Design a protein with these regions (language model features):
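Feature captures the catalytic ectodomains and active-site-proximal regions of enzymes
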Residues: 1-134
Length: 134
């Protein structure tokens, strides 16, 4: 896509200028294909890759759990708030309407989990080559 974008022309122009260009982007996403059942109350957030709330019910072997949000510098709307994160290609699905939502969200790109693709932020510094004789 770079060749056909405005960025390509911008990089070409900047390659003739004595400058440094720093390129970065937001975190990425991951293609999900493995549902994990989770139960929460009606105040539980709707994100498919992480949940926060009170009284979350899940299989602890399938998720990464933070029971004390302050220790991870995360906000806690209530004293009993905990966070549950999906890893790898997993996504959360509620047992009610499970058979409807699993095919709907399977093979979609999601973010908010703890995979490398979602946690790492790409960063590159571009410097023009020095030209001989000028």
């Amino acid at each position: 896509w770079l060749r056909h974008s405005g960025m390509s022309e911008l990089f070409r122009v900047l390659s003739h200028v004595d400058c440094h260009v720093i390129v970065t982007t937001d975190h990425g996403s991951i293609r999900t294909n493995r549902p994990i059942k989770i139960v929460g109350d009606r105040n539980t957030n709707t994100n498919l890759r992480y949940k926060l709330g009170k009284n979350l019910n899940y299989n602890p072997r399938e998720v990464f759990v933070i029971k004390t949000p302050a220790e991870a510098q995360l906000p806690a709307p209530n004293l009993s708030t905990s966070y549950v994160f999906a890893s790898g290609a997993a996504f959360f699905a509620y047992p009610n309407n499970y058979n409807y939502y699993v095919p709907y969200y399977k093979d979609t790109f999601q973010h908010g989990g703890i995979s490398m693709e979602e946690m790492l932020i790409p960063l590159v510094t571009l410097t023009p080559r020095r030209r001989m004789g000028g």
